[in-house]
């Protein structure tokens, strides 16, 4: 695991979020049958404990796919990651764009290559702040000037989806609706272990 990459990324994402907010981590052990409850782990850390959080992720990264919740949670939950009603602040807008290849559930048309996907993003204004390569696509980010309460940003998330759905449709490509506040996204510095060939999750 690239701990420095993971830590620097999370610091950028949550830089303006109050330290007492909670970050949820979801991990799946790819050495265990995915349907088994034992394959799933949920971790919690406060925003002001990012170094500790990354230390906790390091041993998991050898066998797990690891995601984090883009929205902070108001409190640490006893069970599960929670839903929209548990989310507090959104620090950035995001996309989750699959690129054609193995491992995707959809039969819809997807951008054929990384080059095509990056060209599409490059044509959009404002430009991205980060583009994370997930091992099966990309997750671009646009940081907000200030974290926005989920109750306020919900209509904007719907509009964001419709905007990008239209853009991709013009190219003949499909976009999943992955813009719920409780959305989880991959942590750079970890690995996509969906197949036997582990692929580093990096920043383009």
What are these regions (language model features)?
Residues 1-136, 143-166:
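Signature for HUH/AEP ssDNA processing cores
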Residues 138-139, 194:
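Flexible loop/turn segments at secondary-structure boundaries
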């Amino acid at each position: 695991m690239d701990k420095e990459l993971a830590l620097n990324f999370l610091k950028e994402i949550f830089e303006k979020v109050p330290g007492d907010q909670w970050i949820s981590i979801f991990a799946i052990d790819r050495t265990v049958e995915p349907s088994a409850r034992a394959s799933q782990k949920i971790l919690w850390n406060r925003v002001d404990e990012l170094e500790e959080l990354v230390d906790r992720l390091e041993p998991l990264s050898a066998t797990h796919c690891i995601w984090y919740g883009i929205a902070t949670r108001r409190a640490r939950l006893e069970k599960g990651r929670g839903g929209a009603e548990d989310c507090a602040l959104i620090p950035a807008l995001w996309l989750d764009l699959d690129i054609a290849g193995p491992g995707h559930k959809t039969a819809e048309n997807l951008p054929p290559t990384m080059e095509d996907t990056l060209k599409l993003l490059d044509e959009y204004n404002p430009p991205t702040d980060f583009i994370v390569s997930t091992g099966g696509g990309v997750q671009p980010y646009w940081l907000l000037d200030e974290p926005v309460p989920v109750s306020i940003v919900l209509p904007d998330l719907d509009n964001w989806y419709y905007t990008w759905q239209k853009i991709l449709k013009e190219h003949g490509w499909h976009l999943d609706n992955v813009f719920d506040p409780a959305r989880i996204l991959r942590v750079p510095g970890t690995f996509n272990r969906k197949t036997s060939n582990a692929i580093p999750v990096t920043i383009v």
